[in-house]
Regions:
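Acidic, metal-coordinating helix/loop segments flanking the phosphotransfer/catalytic sites
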Residues: 35-54
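Non-catalytic signal-transmission and effector/linker regions of two-component phosphorelay proteins
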Residues: 1-10, 16-17, 76, 80, ...
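Hydrophobic/aromatic residues positioned on beta-strands within the core alpha/beta folds
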Residues: 86-87
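Two-component/phosphorelay signaling modules centered on CheY-like receiver
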Residues: 16-34
Length: 126
């Protein structure tokens, strides 16, 4: 058993069932998970929780900005945070994401997302 703290993942998703599924998959993989329902709420969470190590966000959300814009803002404020962006409606190009950001198309397997976050945060076996 590892003594290192669990990686905290912020999941940003406005669809409750998708949010619950993503959170459950990440929790099952050993991550601590918190949620936000839009970009503005995500930025509040990011400010409240300096221990957040990864953000997994949907692209299409209500509010002032979408998930790609959120990814850029998060990277500006916290370049140490791993960023994954997801969508089933559009394909996000690498050039649209901040440095190091990744795109995962919906539908996705929760285990795949958990493995990717583990690799990118250096906690491949959370």
């Amino acid at each position: 058993m590892s003594d290192r703290p669990k990686t905290v993942v912020l999941v940003v998703e406005d669809e409750p069932l998708i949010l619950m599924d993503a959170m459950q998959s990440l929790e099952d993989a050993g991550f601590d998970v918190i949620e936000a329902y839009d970009g503005e709420h995500a930025l509040v969470r990011l400010a409240e929780r300096p221990d957040i190590g990864a953000v997994f966000t949907d692209v299409n959300m209500p509010g002032r900005f979408d998930g790609v814009q959120l990814a850029r803002i998060v990277h500006e404020r916290r370049p140490d945070v791993v960023i994954l962006v997801t969508s089933g409606a559009i394909k996000v190009e690498w050039s649209e994401l901040p440095e190091g950001g990744r795109f995962v198309s919906k539908p996705y397997r929760g285990e795949h997302v958990a493995t990717l976050i583990g690799k990118l945060t250096g906690t491949a076996s959370p």
